[in-house]
């Protein structure tokens, strides 16, 4: 088993519904450590930059509007197989297909407002972490 880091966003819908603590509890209960965290209200430019890979997709404008509609929590998670572990905790992208007990199954209302984002691979995790956090903002936990 490998200790990995992954990136997570609690999206505006879940922040507005006060699900931050419950979601953090799920991360920690699954053995993931939160080693960096902050609340930000994304600008249009930040959202467009973060989701640049989707810029040609028809949903891009709506995604940017949603992600700038309110504050988000961004965090770095660390643990064994963190990328896969977080994706399992999140559940299917479409909440209608997400199992109960997953974040999207329990907290998401629609595919457009699906509560959380998580990196899909180690490479994207490294890129996404660097987008929001400087090296000195990430605090490895040794205890």
Swiss-Prot record:
InterPro entries registered for this protein in UniProt: NDK-like_dom, NDK-like_dom_sf, Nucleoside_diP_kinase, Nucleoside_diP_kinase_AS
Enzyme nomenclature, EC number: 2.7.4.6
PROSITE patterns reported for this sequence: NDPK, NDPK_LIKE
Cofactor entry: Mg(2+)
Catalytic function, reaction form: a 2'-deoxyribonucleoside 5'-diphosphate + ATP = a 2'-deoxyribonucleoside 5'-triphosphate + ADP; a ribonucleoside 5'-diphosphate + ATP = a ribonucleoside 5'-triphosphate + ADP
Compartments in which it is found: Cytoplasm
Residues annotated for ATP binding in this entry: 11, 59, 87, 93, 104, 114
Main location group: cytoplasm
Entry's Gene Ontology BP terms: CTP biosynthetic process; GTP biosynthetic process; UTP biosynthetic process
EC category name: transferase
Catalytic residues, chain numbering: 117 (pros-phosphohistidine intermediate)
A cellular component annotation (GO) from this entry: cytoplasm
GO molecular function: ATP binding; metal ion binding; nucleoside diphosphate kinase activity
SUPFAM superfamilies: Nucleoside diphosphate kinase, NDK (SSF54919)
Highest taxon of the lineage: Bacteria
HAMAP family membership: NDP_kinase (MF_00451)
Record family assignment: Belongs to the NDK family.
Its job: Major role in the synthesis of nucleoside triphosphates other than ATP. The ATP gamma phosphate is transferred to the NDP beta phosphate via a ping-pong mechanism, using a phosphorylated active-site intermediate.
Protein name: Nucleoside diphosphate kinase
Gene: ndk
